[in-house]
Curated annotation (Swiss-Prot):
The chain crosses the membrane at residues 6-25, 89-106. Keywords: Cell inner membrane, Cell membrane, Membrane, Transmembrane, Transmembrane helix. Belongs to the universal stress protein B family. It is found in: Cell inner membrane. The keyword Transmembrane helix applies. Pfam families: UspB (PF10625). InterPro entries: Universal_stress_protein_B (IPR019598). It is a multi-pass membrane protein. It comes from Vibrio cholerae serotype O1 (strain ATCC 39315 / El Tor Inaba N16961). GO terms for cellular component: plasma membrane. This is Universal stress protein B homolog.
Amino acid sequence: MISGDTILFALMLVTAINVARYVTALRSLIYIMREAHPLLYQQVDGRGFFTTHGNVTKQVRLYHYLKSREYHHHHDPVFTGKCDRVRELFILSGSLLVLTTVVAFML
């Protein structure tokens, strides 16, 4: 029989991998955003997005942009595809984080 620690370790590993995928996709989205949508790049502080002094309100602006799917009106299919990917990975990573936390408290 599989122990609870093994299940928790496997969940943590899957969660860590998906969070890494999300951060990588977010970095590439911000890189593409510089060319495809310069105004949004400036609004979300693209250059300082991943720095320690990054402005949280500007990061929340990108969250709301992706949440409300405003990117569907954009003309660049690469940009809209990347936005879809980042949105899906954010939902997946968030769900896995919640699930892993619940399982950790149950064990």
